[in-house]
């Protein structure tokens, strides 16, 4: 909302749905803070659209990692933000297409 920027010097985030679930509220606040911190700390940006591809969950997970939401302290945040997206957040394509995954599971050496 640019009105609040010009008159109050603040930023408003109006893109989150109302919820009373504490984990979802924390995830939304953490996402807003991470995006704001990245916007403040970047020296330059390039405005171009990046295709999401066939797996939006993987694309959003890598975006969250670029924001710095890495580690066990952000595991719950990532879980809440990714739970409604289609696709596998851990694999870009179907995991059965990867040779290393197939070798591990054909030997019976599942981890």
Predicted features along the sequence, with ranges:
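C-terminal accessory/tail domains of diverse enzymes
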Residues: 1-111
């Amino acid at each position: 909302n640019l009105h609040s920027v010009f008159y109050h010097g603040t930023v408003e985030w109006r893109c989150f749905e109302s919820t009373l679930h504490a984990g979802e509220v924390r995830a939304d606040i953490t996402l807003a803070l991470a995006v704001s911190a990245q916007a403040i700390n970047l020296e330059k940006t390039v405005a171009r659209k990046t295709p999401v591809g066939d797996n939006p969950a993987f694309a959003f997970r890598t975006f969250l990692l670029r924001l710095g939401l890495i580690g066990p302290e952000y595991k719950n945040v990532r879980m809440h933000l990714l739970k409604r997206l289609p696709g596998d957040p851990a694999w870009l394509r179907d995991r059965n297409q990867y040779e290393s995954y197939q070798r591990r599971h054909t030997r019976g050496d599942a981890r």
